[in-house]
Regions:
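Exposed, flexible binding/inhibitory loops of compact, secreted disulfide-stabilized domains
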Residues: 17-142
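Bacterial Sec-dependent N-terminal signal peptides
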Residues: 1-23
Length: 142
């Protein structure tokens, strides 16, 4: 009986060690950019300034915090999440970024509002430490 109990305990411990841990990954939200090319993939990992400049432009505004967020591609990369253009008010917000089983999992929230008189493209850009650059990015809507 003792051997069976020891065996079962060992199996449980071994199995629990193989379960992927979910580790939060720090990120910074990039502000004051606009989409240049609206025909982009819905999730985009960008690792260089030239690639970033191909998809996004600077949208500086006057006043406090009017400058675009600085991105240093020697130490960072970005993940952008875009939705199709819409004439509805749409809020797109990152919830968290986690590392799990060799992947980065980007969770986000979408809130759809009333119809507008204009068309806009909801998006956000997050800045992530370059040490996570090799990870594949998957997404999860909450």
């Amino acid at each position: 009986m003792r051997k069976i109990l020891l065996f079962v305990s060992s199996v449980v411990i071994f199995c629990s060690c193989n379960v992927g841990k979910v580790v939060p990954v720090d990120y910074e939200l990039a502000n004051n950019y606009f989409v240049i090319n609206p025909r982009l993939p819905s999730t985009l990992k960008i690792t260089s300034q030239s690639e970033f400049d191909h998809y996004f432009g600077l949208a500086a505004v006057m006043g406090k915090n009017g400058e675009p967020t600085t991105i240093d591609f020697t130490r960072q990369f970005v993940i952008a999440k875009l939705l199709p253009e819409s004439n509805r008010a749409v809020g797109l917000t990152p919830v968290n970024l986690n590392r799990s089983d060799g992947q980065l999992v980007l969770s986000y929230r979408v809130e759809r509002g009333k119809q507008q008189q204009w068309v806009s493209q909801p998006f956000f850009i997050i800045i992530v430490d370059k040490k996570y650059q090799k990870y594949n990015v998957t997404e999860k809507m909450e």
